[in-house]
Amino acid sequence: MGLSISEIRKNTTRARHLMQRTRAQRFAVGAFNIDNQETLIAVARAAQKLQSPVLVEVSDAEVKAMGLENVRDLVDNYKAEYGIEMYLNLDHGPTVEGCKRAIDAGYEFIHIDISQANHNASDEEIIAKTREVVEYAKFTGALVESEPHYFGGSSNVHTEDINYEEIKKTFSTPEGARAFVEATGIDTFAAAIGNLHGKYPVPKVLDLDLLADIREAIHCQISLHGGSGTPLHYFEDAVKIGVSKININSDMRYAFRTTLEKTLRENPNEYAIVKLMPPVYVAVQEVVESKIKAFNSVRKAVV
């Protein structure tokens, strides 16, 4: 069941107020990727328990698996059931058309990432297509996020170490961030400061001095992608500097899979899926709760 334009605009207005609160109250909202209804429930339970605002997000693969509008309906249903402040983000949308469909479906947050589909996309193409989404989003008030180039990793569990000499080549710069924000009019800039998609065998190292310089250079919100596997103290410091949104995916997937595998080993004769899920809910919820606490968003929800 689709939302009316008045309902969508009401939601995006509340989403904008949330992002303003992150700056004023020095917290970040967690953006938690969901792969299915079970992970959505885990996020909702964590948000309710800690009275925290949350974003749930889906990328292209999840959209294809679950359906753009189906995800919208699920989020609205659980938001109402749990009485929580929860919004929906399209994560790493690779096409203008896909982003427009999400805007029409009432997604409050849109991440347009042209370089996701084409790592060699030109600056001109990235700016033009990002600007097109920004203009389209004005009809509903959806907040648009983007970045000027692709940065590496994948939302998986990796066995290789992190090559920071290579990663540094993709770091954001204050000058580049300012130029991109001014050229596109985005609401949120996705900074690259050592954050990397995926979970690695070594902890990630974030350049907080660079983050502070970027914060000084731009007026809009700042997000950090690739939050999984990052020592929590980095998040605590990033929030103080002024990061408003932090993405988490691989840590949740790892908790889901490893807990499910353990549960299956311990219950070899159980075939009722709903009876196998309770430990999985708990494991994923614990991951979400730990991030919420590090992001300083406990008791920051406005319902």
Question: What kind of region is each of these model predictions?
Answer:
Residues 13-21, 36-62, 68-83, 87, ...:
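Alpha/beta enzyme core
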Residues 9, 120, 201, 278, ...:
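Charge-dense, low-complexity intrinsically disordered segments
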Residues 147, 225-228:
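Glycine-rich beta-strand-to-loop/alpha-helix junction loops that act as flexible
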Residues 1-30:
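N-terminal amphipathic alpha-helix/helix-capping segment at the start of soluble metabolic enzymes
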Residues 2-5, 231-303:
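C-terminal alpha-helical cap/extension of soluble enzyme domains
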